[in-house]
């Protein structure tokens, strides 16, 4: 029983051990499997971590490469922008330098133009000055020559008196009687001419008085102090008194020659008659009869004599008449103006005044054949001159002026289409150049246009 029990217990023990062994084996298997699983998971984790590390490294490398590329691109862009800015700045500098050079050239050209213009104006002023100086010298020389001639006349008269007192020759007396007869005939002719001159003077005076009254009534705006009719009356009275005094002196000389029986030699008579300077009252009358043929020469001679010496004798007046008649020429076709001579010095009765002044635009043609308007300051005086200045101070006159005695027509073109509100004034002037008529055009406001026209037309020559 005990053996059976022992066998049973050993069997159970073996079975238990076998069971335990199986459980251990199973457990060992499970552990081995777990270990394998852990190893596999560890390997997988390592692979994943390696892959992740590679991915991260690759990602960072790509990012670094992108940053490097962006850095290089930015550096290129910065260089390009710097080059562009430098190029643009250089171009701007070049354009500015060119503009500077152009402006300097323009300034030099303008300075040269202004200098040349001023030099031309100075030359014109110097020419005018020289012309005035020559005119003054000529007038002074004429005055000196007149004084010399008067002195020579006095000396010759003294010689004639000496010859008449010393000579008692019948031949000279006969010759003087013959000359006396001839001179008497010439005196008669001169008296007839004098009557004609007086009639012409009266007609001229009446015409001028009518014209002056008409102009005074029409142009009451113009203030001109002119005493022309009185001067004409004085000239006619001086001519009549001088010629009557010459006739009385001639008759008195002939009576003295016939009564006293004084004579001169033939040589002296021939020399005195051949020269232009009168030597005796008889030769004075002969020279006056030969030289005085027109009304203009008689009036001029009498006026010059009366203005030069008011206290001289009748013989001196006649001698000066003859000298002036010999030097002056007859003027028959001179147009009559409104009691205005060519200069204020030749007519002391005329007092020059400024009638109108103001700004006008004068049309001129440039070098490119285009019409340009030049604004200038003009003044019109009673001596018939229209002067041009650069400004209203009238310190710098231009070389251009218009003599209204040569103007024969004036027209107005109203409402200029190129310049609204302005009208054109056209002056037609006679010239001695190739083109006989010159047209000068001025532009001014339509309100002042008629005023300028009235002023200019009042100073134009009268149409006969």
From Swiss-Prot:
SUPFAM superfamilies: PH domain-like
Coiled-coil segments on the chain, per record: 8-210
Ranges of residues in domain PH: 353-461
Keywords, sorted A to Z: Coiled coil
Gene3D superfamilies listed in its UniProt record: Pleckstrin-homology domain (PH domain)/Phosphotyrosine-binding domain (PTB) (2.30.29.30)
PANTHER family: COILED-COIL DOMAIN-CONTAINING PROTEIN 6 (PTHR15276:SF0), H4 D10S170 PROTEIN-RELATED (PTHR15276)
Protein name: PH domain-containing rcdII
């Amino acid at each position: 029983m005990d053996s059976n029990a022992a066998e049973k217990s050993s069997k159970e023990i073996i079975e238990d051990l076998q069971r335990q062994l199986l459980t251990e084996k199973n457990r060992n298997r499970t552990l081995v499997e777990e270990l394998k699983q852990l190893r596999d998971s560890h390997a997988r984790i390592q692979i994943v971590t390696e892959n992740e590390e590679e991915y991260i490294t690759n990602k960072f490398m790509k990012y670094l490469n992108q940053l490097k590329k962006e850095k290089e691109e930015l550096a290129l862009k910065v260089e390009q922008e710097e080059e562009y800015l430098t190029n643009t700045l250089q171009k701007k500098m070049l354009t500015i330098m060119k503009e500077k050079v152009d402006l300097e050239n323009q300034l030099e050209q303008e300075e040269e133009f202004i200098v040349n213009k001023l030099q031309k104006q100075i030359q014109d002023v110097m020419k005018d000055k020289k012309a005035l100086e020559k005119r003054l010298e000529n007038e002074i020389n004429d005055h000196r020559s007149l004084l010399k001639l008067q002195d020579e006349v006095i000396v010759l008269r003294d010689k004639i008196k000496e010859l008449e007192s010393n000579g008692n020759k019948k031949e000279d007396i006969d010759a003087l009687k013959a000359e006396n007869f001839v001179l008497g005939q010439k005196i008669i002719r001169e008296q007839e001419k004098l009557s004609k001159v007086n009639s012409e003077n009266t007609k001229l005076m009446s015409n001028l008085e009518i014209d002056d009254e008409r102009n005074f009534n029409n142009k009451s705006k113009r203030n001109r102090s002119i005493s022309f009719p009185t001067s004409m009356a004085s000239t006619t009275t001086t001519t009549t008194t001088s010629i009557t005094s010459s006739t009385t002196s001639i008759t008195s000389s002939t009576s003295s020659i016939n009564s006293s029986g004084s004579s001169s030699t033939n040589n002296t008579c021939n020399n005195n008659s051949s020269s232009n300077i009168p030597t005796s009252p008889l030769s004075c009358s002969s020279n006056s009869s030969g030289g005085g043929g027109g009304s203009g020469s008689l009036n001029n001679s009498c006026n010059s004599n009366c203005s030069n010496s008011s206290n001289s004798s009748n013989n001196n007046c006649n001698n000066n008449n003859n000298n002036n008649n010999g030097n002056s020429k007859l003027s028959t076709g001179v147009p009559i103006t409104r009691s205005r001579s060519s200069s204020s010095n030749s007519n002391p009765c005329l007092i020059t005044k400024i009638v109108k002044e103001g700004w006008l635009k004068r049309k001129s043609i440039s070098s490119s054949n285009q019409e340009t308007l030049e604004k200038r300051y003009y003044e019109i005086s009673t001596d018939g001159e229209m002067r041009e200045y650069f400004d209203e101070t009238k310190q710098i006159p231009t070389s251009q002026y218009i003599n209204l005695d040569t103007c024969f027509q004036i027209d107005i073109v109203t409402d200029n289409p190129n310049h609204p509100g302005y009208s054109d004034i056209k002056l037609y002037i006679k010239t001695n150049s190739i083109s006989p008529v010159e047209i000068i055009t001025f532009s001014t406001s339509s309100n002042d246009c008629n005023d300028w026209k009235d002023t200019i037309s009042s100073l134009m020559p009268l149409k006969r």
